[in-house]
A protein has these predicted regions:
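TPR/TPR-like (Sel1-like) alpha-helical repeat modules
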Residues: 122-144
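Helix-start (N-cap) detector for alpha-helical repeat units in TPR-like alpha-solenoids
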Residues: 6-7, 41-42, 75-77, 111-112
Length: 172
């Protein structure tokens, strides 16, 4: 039965949250999956991601670290990027920076890491580096500024987007 399959629960929760469903309800589904299998690295990764989207940055970091510990060699998702993004959303740009650099190195084809890194550099006042990252991002995708409705907090959306606008040289 799907209700007892951690993989189905986690995938459904992530997909529905991405489409804008109630994130608290989706986190309950992920929590259920982790009750069924506490060693499910992908479940911890998705939990960290949803917690970051919900603005629960400390829990996002903790759950993403668990995913990395459970699956240190085979990545089950961009947990390092989630940790960097959570530090960024908590306005700890100095802590976010090394994680986002590592995330970009781990998966140079993932545009998310470039976006978070460019925004982080911009908020640190390092605009030349932010613009260089945007150049690299454009080699991966033409979409520099994405839809950020996954971030449930208007403050977090604006923090991320304002950094990207600075990085591309747009007016704040």
């Amino acid at each position: 039965m799907a209700g007892d399959d951690p993989g189905v629960l986690v995938n459904a929760a992530y997909t529905l949250a991405d489409f804008g469903e109630n994130i608290s309800t989706m986190m309950v589904l992920v929590d259920r999956a982790l009750e069924l299998n506490p060693n499910f690295a992908r479940g911890w990764y998705i939990s960290g991601t949803l917690r970051a989207w919900a603005g629960q940055t400390e829990i996002a970091i903790e759950h993403s670290k668990i995913a990395l510990r459970l699956s240190p060699r085979v990545r089950v998702g961009p947990s390092v990027m989630t940790i960097g993004a959570a530090h960024f959303l908590a306005r700890r740009f100095d802590e976010a920076l090394p994680k986002l650099l590592l995330a970009m190195q781990e998966d140079p084809s993932h545009p998310g890491a470039y976006r978070w890194l460019a925004s982080c550099y911009a908020h640190m006042g390092r605009l030349d580096e932010a613009r260089q990252v945007v150049k690299q991002l454009r080699a991966v995708t033409p979409d520099v500024i994405p839809n950020v409705s996954f971030l449930r907090s208007a403050e977090h959306r604006e923090l991320f987007l304002s950094g990207l606008r600075l990085a591309i040289g747009a007016e704040p």
